[in-house]
């Protein structure tokens, strides 16, 4: 299965007692599929992977693979701070039914570019899944440079990159590396339309947890090269782009999901959305219902 279009980085629903809410998880998965998403990420940073036990990771991924049943690709977040642990987690994800591993640069340890290259080559060689590189320097403390990516794209098991940096020059440098076997995916909702109009294959999104159809519509327009229509739709979604970054991810998007009946909060050290931002969450959650309906109608008419 190819990677393109709208791919949701799923939030993990918890119940009032803080345990996994598997009923909410299954409802979220089905809502995403109904909204037209073209891929799903389980247990990434938006999914609070760092707060999950091994058993919970297994449960989420196994349930997702079973429910999705091959309708769209399932990517598992497997990146950890050490290479051996990342390889083991990637093998674990393969056994649980993931089709791809989303492998973030090792957090906190700040390897050199040579170290990053060696790390990703080892995971690609030994992990047992196709690897999507993930660069998000604001979270990890290190930046996977395009020239290093250029040295990795020839590996048959390295199939793409999720790039969270939004600078046009960074996007252009990565898009120049794309091929039939290597895709570039935006990891930033706010700049994704520009990235796709510039040649990126899609978006791994946070806000699409709450608005799968609306972000599918954005991706369709941008990937089709409909510049004016994509810009107009992007402007319509700009409040959601901005809101989902108003506090640490996934705090804001989980506030939207909670208002839609999916989940009841976060795990420490993350706290619920601050009181100052609750009115915006109320308004945007209400507006999302109409926006999703409009998106579905427009996609049917297209």
Swiss-Prot record:
Return the EC number. 4.3.3.7
So, what pathway does this thing act in? Amino-acid biosynthesis; L-lysine biosynthesis via DAP pathway; (S)-tetrahydrodipicolinate from L-aspartate: step 3/4
- Extract the Gene3D superfamilies matched here: Aldolase class I (3.20.20.70)
Q: Name one Pfam family in it.
A: DHDPS
- Output one GO BP term: lysine biosynthetic process via diaminopimelate
**Subcellular localization, as worded in the UniProt entry:** Cytoplasm
Site, Part of a proton relay during catalysis: residue positions:
45, 108
Task: Summarize where pyruvate binds, as residue positions.
Answer: 46, 204
- GO MF annotations in UniProt: 4-hydroxy-tetrahydrodipicolinate synthase activity
Known catalytic reactions? L-aspartate 4-semialdehyde + pyruvate = (2S,4S)-4-hydroxy-2,3,4,5-tetrahydrodipicolinate + H2O + H(+)
Top-level taxonomic group: Bacteria
SMART domains xrefs: DHDPS
Q: Does the keyword Amino-acid biosynthesis apply?
A: yes
Recite the UniProt keywords alphabetically. Amino-acid biosynthesis, Cytoplasm, Diaminopimelate biosynthesis, Lyase, Lysine biosynthesis, Schiff base
One cellular component term from this protein's GO annotations in UniProt: cytosol
Q: Which NCBIfam families match?
A: dapA
Assembly behavior: Homotetramer; dimer of dimers.
Which HAMAP family does the entry mention? Answer: DapA
Role this protein plays: Catalyzes the condensation of (S)-aspartate-beta-semialdehyde [(S)-ASA] and pyruvate to 4-hydroxy-tetrahydrodipicolinate (HTPA).
Q: What is this protein called?
A: 4-hydroxy-tetrahydrodipicolinate synthase
Its source organism is Xanthomonas axonopodis pv. citri (strain 306)
**Gene expressing this chain:** dapA
